[in-house]
A protein has these predicted regions:
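N-terminal periplasmic "start-of-domain" segments of outer-membrane beta-barrel proteins
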Residues: 43-79, 101-105, 133
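C-terminal beta-signal and adjacent terminal beta-strands/loops
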Residues: 73, 521, 563, 611, ...
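Extracytoplasmic beta-strand/coil segments of soluble accessory domains associated
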Residues: 82, 86-130
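Short acidic/polar hinge/loop motifs at secondary-structure boundaries
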Residues: 126-157, 176, 491, 533
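Short strand-turn segments of transmembrane beta-barrel domains in outer membranes
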Residues: 154-162, 171-204, 215, 223, ...
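Transmembrane beta-barrel wall of Gram-negative outer-membrane proteins
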Residues: 190-219, 224-263, 287-304, 348, ...
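Membrane-embedded beta-barrel scaffold of Gram-negative outer-membrane proteins
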Residues: 298-300, 308-326, 463-475, 493-549, ...
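Gram-negative outer-membrane beta-barrel transporters
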Residues: 354-355, 417-421, 430, 517-524, ...
Length: 699
């Protein structure tokens, strides 16, 4: 048996021991709860509370915090689950190189967050970002999510919230799944480029056990000359029950599988001289395949003393193979510069905690203490060379065991009717264990390293006066860096971020009418990750500073007319004065929604991404773009013996604008060009005007 196989066995044994330890703690907690229940004076029978829709305001700790309800999600174009993120002020998503089946590129608060390096994503309480990922640190692929199963999206920005840790520098996004459906759904849709989508959602039981089953399939060839052949299949099942009058338990399982072709990044010079069209390709063999299998459990018990014990656990199996070619024939003039990135892992962990509300010295208060545990057991992470998806060499191949243990404490106090304090602290302890699996590779990272960080948080909320609140926020946070770079000494294990913001939210007309918000924020980060074209990965750079302004408005403006709009300005640069590549200065989003009493809902949206520097010396810039989308949903006036029909239409890029998604500047070489290559802008073309319509049966 070789050294690598022994190491993999050892790290798996360690992983199993850690999991057993965590489960033991969870079981002890559950036994404690059961003992409390045994003395609970409340009657033992189970009471099932029906689902109730409410529009009550959630208290927030920052002017930039928000909740996106499902009614806004359903008005987004279908096909890319990440579309919902543009409802967040300043959040832009675009398709990245490598094809539609992989994670999008995310922009927020002056970050090109790549695939999630500085934005933390969650589905319920399970983290989505993947540490030490084969394609990029914090990789967050949202394509396993079925948008119609989402009840709402919680959004926070900045480093001010104790319950969020790794990757929460620019912000955090939590998708909350439904428990049950009021109506079952069967839906079919189709559009240009051979696009098809089919959806089935059912709630077979809605009483003692509330169940949800959903499945969707999606296929498109896209507008490219090299057909995408993108196929995605998702299935999800969830069951929720109340073991006692004060407790709730849910279990969720989901599976995702996708494969696709990609046209890669197009060099501007090849389009300008007619070598290829905007939707052509230099290397048509690019693409990928991926799969997720996820299991999650959640439990909470509400004590008679106004407290809550909560626990959850998750396990995910994940696999990705990605074939790309960024520089074409720069490094290998004969076979080409194709790159293969492979990632195969298990991720598991969970949360334990207790929340208690009450009075502290006569002051309304709430305290939450929790522990978050996570382990990424990566059996194989590989970067290699390939030609037409056939491996030609290996650059680095590793096995990684990366774990974190994160206790946190959160306190909420209201000492005065017009003042709230929300603060806390979290500690994060990481272990990085890397084993080399390739004795002949040019890169052979190996070793073990530990790192810890303490992150204080503080928020002051003043008001409300005349439906207006004022916010002051401060906190520190971090993103972790790739374990391979960490053990090799090339990067700080935990890149510290320090942020602050002040803001105001106001509903001058009250009720469901227009809400206005404005925020000024500031963020320092001591280690930046930037894109490297040669390998299609990221590298660690120096400290950066960002600051900016966000303004927004959302709500009812008159009768059936609603608006959701935002504008952001950001200044971002390295502390030595150089520009941060890809950081946008300006973003804007606006949606006018019309909810007609005849059963028709209409929405027109605009999304704007401003000019971005592509190089640190500011000599090459990516152009800005402005795209309009149209959505129509209409409840058909057809009487059915059971249920109702709804028709829908999405028109993306309504004005058929030529625009660019992911855009980079680096050196590449086409056939017959000089050996040193040519520095140029490379881009993924945005979709042209696209129509998609369908019919849904609700019953």
């Amino acid at each position: 048996m070789d050294v690598s196989s022994v190491h993999v066995k050892n790290v798996r044994d360690v992983s199993i021991r850690r999991l057993l330890l965590f489960l033991s703690v969870a079981i002890m907690g559950l036994r404690f709860v059961e003992s409390v229940q045994a003395h609970d004076p409340d009657p033992p029978e189970v009471i099932i509370v029906p689902e109730v829709t409410t529009s009550a305001e959630r208290p927030v700790a920052a002017s930039s915090q928000q909740f996106i309800p499902d009614k806004e999600i359903l008005l987004q174009p279908q096909g890319r689950p990440a579309q919902v993120l543009r409802l967040i002020p300043g959040f832009i998503t675009v398709e990245h190189s490598g094809g539609a089946g992989k994670a999008d590129q995310y922009f927020l608060r002056g970050f090109d967050a790549d695939h999630g390096t500085d934005v933390a994503f969650f589905i319920d309480n399970m983290p989505i970002n993947l540490r030490t990922h084969g394609h990029g640190q914090g990789y967050a692929d949202l394509n396993f999510i079925i948008p119609e199963t989402i009840q709402g999206v919680d959004v926070v920005k900045g480093t001010y919230h104790a319950e969020f840790g790794d990757f929460n520098t620019a912000g955090a996004v939590r998708f909350k799944t439904r428990e049950v459906l009021q109506e079952n759904v069967v839906q079919g849709a189709g559009g240009q480029f051979d696009t098809q989508r089919y959806l089935l959602m059912l709630s077979p039981t809605k009483d003692k056990v509330r169940t949800l089953f959903a499945a969707d399939g999606y296929y498109t060839n896209g507008p490219f000359e090299n057909d995408n052949r993108y196929f995605r299949f998702n299935v999800m099942g969830k069951a929720t029950m109340n073991p006692t009058v004060r407790s709730e338990f849910s279990v969720t399982g989901s599976y995702n599988k996708a494969n696709w072709n990609a046209s890669g990044e197009v060099p501007f010079r090849a389009v300008a001289d007619g070598t290829i069209s905007r939707f052509g390709s230099i290397d048509p063999s690019e693409g990928g395949k991926t799969q997720h299998a996820i299991g999650r459990m959640e439990y909470h018990y509400d004590t008679p003393s106004n407290g809550r014990f909560f626990a959850d656990a998750y396990l995910m199996y994940y696999k990705l193979d990605l074939w790309t070619n960024f520089t074409f024939f720069l490094n290998d003039p004969v076979r080409g510069d194709g790159v293969n990135q492979h990632d195969q892992r298990y991720m598991y962990g969970g949360n334990l905690g207790y929340e208690q509300a009450g009075q502290l010295f006569g002051i309304r208060s709430s305290a939450t203490a929790g522990l978050q545990v996570r382990n990424d057991s990566i059996a194989n992470i590989r970067l290699g060379t390939q030609t037409k998806r056939t491996a030609t060499g290996t650059i680095v191949e590793s096995a990684v065991e990366e774990a974190s243990y994160s206790p946190y404490l959160k306190l909420e106090l209201q000492p005065l009717p017009w003042m709230r304090l929300v603060g806390g602290v979290r500690a994060d302890y990481f272990t990085f264990d890397v084993q080399n699996l390739c004795e002949t590779c040019p890169q052979q990272p190996t070793g073990r390293k530990d790192s810890a960080q303490v992150s204080p948080k503080g928020n002051l909320i003043f008001g409300p006066w005349f439906n207006t609140e004022f916010f002051v926020n401060y906190g520190t946070g971090f993103h972790s860096n790739d374990a391979r770079s960490t053990v090799a000494g090339g990067s700080t294990p935990l890149a510290r971020a320090q942020g602050t913001e002040v803001g105001v939210r106001s509903k001058p007309w009250g009720g469901e009418r227009l809400e206005l918000l404005a925020t000024f924020w500031w963020l320092d980060l001591n280690s930046e990750l930037v894109f490297v074209g040669d390998a299609g990965t990221t590298e660690v750079r120096g400290p950066t500073r960002r600051y900016g302004v966000e303004v927004g408005a959302r709500g009812q403006i008159y009768g059936p007319f609603y608006v959701n709009g935002s504008f952001t300005w950001t200044h971002a640069q390295f502390k030595d004065g150089l520009a941060i590549p890809l950081a946008p200065d300006l973003t804007a989003y606006s949606a006018l929604i019309m909810r007609w009493p005849e059963g028709l809902s209409s929405q027109i949206q605009l999304t704007y991404l401003g000019v971005r520097n592509l190089t640190e010396d500011r000599t090459i810039k990516a152009p800005s773009w402005l795209v309009f989308d149209l959505t129509e949903r209409y409840q058909l006036p057809i009487k059915l013996s059971h249920g109702r029909f709804e028709a829908f239409l999405f028109v993306q890029n309504l004005l058929d604008t030529d625009w660019e998604g992911a855009t980079f500047a680096f050196t590449s070489r086409l056939p017959n060009e000089p050996a040193g290559g040519v520095q140029d802008i490379h881009f993924v073309p945005g979709n042209p005007r696209f129509f998609m319509g369908g019919l849904a049966w609700y019953f």
